[in-house]
Design a protein with these regions (language model features):
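N-terminal post-signal-peptidase region of extra-cytosolic proteins
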Residues: 1, 26-40, 73-79
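A structural motif detector for short, solvent-exposed N-terminal "entry" segments of globular domains
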Residues: 1-33
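Soluble periplasmic/extracytoplasmic beta-strand elements of cell-envelope proteins
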Residues: 4, 13, 49, 92-94, ...
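Extracytoplasmic
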Residues: 7-9, 22, 45, 88-90, ...
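Short beta-strand segments
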Residues: 21-25, 48, 113-115, 135
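Short, solvent-exposed loop/turn elements at domain surfaces
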Residues: 35-36, 58-61
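Short, surface-exposed secondary-structure junctions/capping segments
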Residues: 35-53
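Exported/periplasmic cell-wall-interacting domains
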Residues: 60-160
Length: 160
């Protein structure tokens, strides 16, 4: 299986080894568009793998900071209390680039930029740009995807 993320369509498609579609989801990528530079706030293009899966047993809407569950569950009240927090919820699929000089090592390293596929608050609009570089998904859809992929699964992010 492998994942294709289309930035122009704002979709994530899970494909089987023969190219058949297993699942397709609306997502939200970076408000700053595509780019691989450190501190750009962009979603990196190119070939990646899922380096780590985090949060396998976490409840939906579990809040993560620094890839660790905080013990909080995201609610409208919590969001009002911390209006500037970038909400990383439910599960994390941590991406690592595989193309040296494009999205791996130096100032373009996807993993060192902490680029994830992660859950987001229910009020987050999908199908539109809006993240700080990560790929945002609906929590229930992320749980389904998380359960279908393994660490090492290839992820291709394209600007088409």
């Amino acid at each position: 299986m492998h994942i294709k993320i289309s930035m122009t369509q704002q979709t994530l498609t899970l494909l089987d080894n023969f190219g058949g579609i297993k699942a397709k989801y609306r997502i939200s990528t970076a408000a700053n568009g595509a780019g691989c530079q450190k501190n750009s706030g962009c979603t990196p293009l190119g070939n990646h793998i899922i380096r780590a899966k985090i949060g396998a047993d976490a409840a939906p809407n579990t809040v993560f900071v620094g890839r660790r569950a905080t013990g909080e569950i995201c609610t409208p009240a919590l969001m009002a209390q911390f209006p500037n927090r970038d909400w990383i919820l439910t599960r994390i699929l941590w991406l690592s680039g595989t193309e040296v000089g494009v999205n791996r090592l130096g100032n373009v390293d996807t993993m060192q930029r902490y680029i994830y596929i992660h859950g987001s608050p229910d009020c987050t609009e999908m199908g539109k740009i809006g993240s700080h570089g990560c790929v945002r998904m609906r929590n229930e859809e992320l749980i389904a995807l998380f359960d279908m992929v393994e660490a090492g699964t290839s992820v291709n992010i394209v600007n088409e």
